[in-house]
Amino acid sequence: MINLRKTHPLMKIINHSFIDLPAPSNISAWWNFGSLLGICLVIQILTGLFLAMHYTSDTLTAFSSVAHICRDVNYGWLIRNLHANGASMFFMCLFLHVGRGIYYGSYLYKETWNIGVMLLLTVTATAFVGYVLPWGQMSFWGATVTTNLFSAIPYIGQTLVEWAWGGFSVDKATLTRFFALHFLLPFVIAGLTLVHLTFLHETGSNNPLGIPSDCDKIPFHPYYSIKDILGLMFLLLVLLSLALFSPDLLGDPDNFSPANPLNTPPHIKPEWYFLFAYAILRSIPNKLGGVLALLASILILLVIPFLHTANQRSMMFRPISQTLFWILTANLITLTWIGGQPVEQPFIIIGQPASILYFPLIHHPMPSAGLFENYMPKPKW
């Protein structure tokens, strides 16, 4: 009897993507985050769908509808906590996934990498419009400050801001369109994910050594499907611990107050996963310069494939590049910390050098280190 999963038109696609997919035999747990991101996306879409059934995108009732979900809807508190903390887990997996791509040279699959950067931008936009929906103080002022950045664009800036707002300030029209975008964009992300996977399966996965592995591949199932389930257990453990024991740990206390245009919070800050870019924005005194640096902080990822100069793909046996990578990681953690602090000394004087260091770390030392490592003495076995 012919195996149905290998002949059926639909099951054949699933089989080639998740069951009989040839995978390198030596990929480590760092390759787990792709599947975890897919699971995070499914969790966010499902919990978001149930939240959308009870949420009202009106400035007068949005805040109270979120309170109603938490108090009156069966397990509404759990769905909301899973959705809010699920976003944090999503970004944690996303940053680790990108970091693994840089460390092991996966960016040399240019199409897959570029689609990945598009995915990162789309997820960032989705998270931003979603943060506005509870219509608390930080939601309102975060939306006002962030959308106002478009006014730095010469000539068309102010028109663009008013077009985004749907009026002359952040109001009902803004909330309605942000809700529509927040509902729609996850499905765009799902579509881009399929494109990302299509390009990945054209080349096959990279591996820690960064060498071709066509001669030594194993089927994805059961080897890596079981391995991914272990990662999923860890993800669910952290997510449920957050959602059940400390649901507001990563949130902002100001968001427990309804939005008030007449009262500005003492310190406006976005969610933790935007803080590194927010710190770079704040470190530059010029508004247009800050906006350009904010965009460049993510778009610089598109340049990385063209800066690869080493003979070896992976950083596994490149000690100088490894050192620079971990300096960059420490720099990003510093920027995340600074972004959450008020604009005062000593945070200003720490944030500015960290912001200045971020771009040259990627642009100059990494290609130079690659060239230098090509001529390092090789061990004689």
Swiss-Prot record:
GO MF annotations in UniProt: metal ion binding; ubiquinol-cytochrome-c reductase activity
CC annotations in GO: mitochondrial inner membrane; respiratory chain complex III
InterPro entries in the cross-refs: Cyt_b/b6_C, Cyt_b/b6_C_sf, Cyt_b/b6_N, Cytb/b6-like_sf, Cytochrome_b, Cytochrome_b_C_euk/bac, Cytochrome_b_N_euk/bac, Di-haem_cyt_TM
The record's free-text note on cofactor binding: Binds 2 heme b groups non-covalently.
Main location (coarse class): mitochondrion
Organism taxonomic ancestry: Eukaryota, Metazoa, Chordata, Craniata, Vertebrata
Further details from the record: Heme 1 (or BL or b562) is low-potential and absorbs at about 562 nm, and heme 2 (or BH or b566) is high-potential and absorbs at about 566 nm.
Keyword Signal: no
Transmembrane segments: 33-53, 77-98, 113-133, 178-198, 226-246, 288-308, 320-340, 347-367
Superkingdom, taxonomy of origin: Eukaryota
Annotated binding of heme b b562, by residue: 83, 182
Its biological purpose: Component of the ubiquinol-cytochrome c reductase complex (complex III or cytochrome b-c1 complex) that is part of the mitochondrial respiratory chain. The b-c1 complex mediates electron transfer from ubiquinol to cytochrome c. Contributes to the generation of a proton gradient across the mitochondrial membrane that is then used for ATP synthesis.
Similarity comment text for this entry: Belongs to the cytochrome b family.
Cofactor(s), names only, from the UniProt record: heme b
The protein's name: Cytochrome b
Keyword Transport: yes
Binding site for a ubiquinone: 201
Binding site for heme b b566: 97, 196
Membrane topology: Multi-pass membrane protein
Subcellular localization(s) per the UniProt record: Mitochondrion inner membrane
SUPFAM superfamilies cross-referenced by the UniProt entry: a domain/subunit of cytochrome bc1 complex (Ubiquinol-cytochrome c reductase) (SSF81648), Transmembrane di-heme cytochromes (SSF81342)
Gene that this sequence comes from: MT-CYB
GO BP term, pick one: mitochondrial electron transport, ubiquinol to cytochrome c
Assembly notes: The cytochrome bc1 complex contains 11 subunits: 3 respiratory subunits (MT-CYB, CYC1 and UQCRFS1), 2 core proteins (UQCRC1 and UQCRC2) and 6 low-molecular weight proteins (UQCRH/QCR6, UQCRB/QCR7, UQCRQ/QCR8, UQCR10/QCR9, UQCR11/QCR10 and a cleavage product of UQCRFS1). This cytochrome bc1 complex then forms a dimer.
Organism of provenance: Sminthopsis youngsoni (Lesser hairy-footed dunnart)
Entry keyword set: Electron transport, Heme, Iron, Membrane, Metal-binding, Mitochondrion, Mitochondrion inner membrane, Respiratory chain, Transmembrane, Transmembrane helix, Transport, Ubiquinone
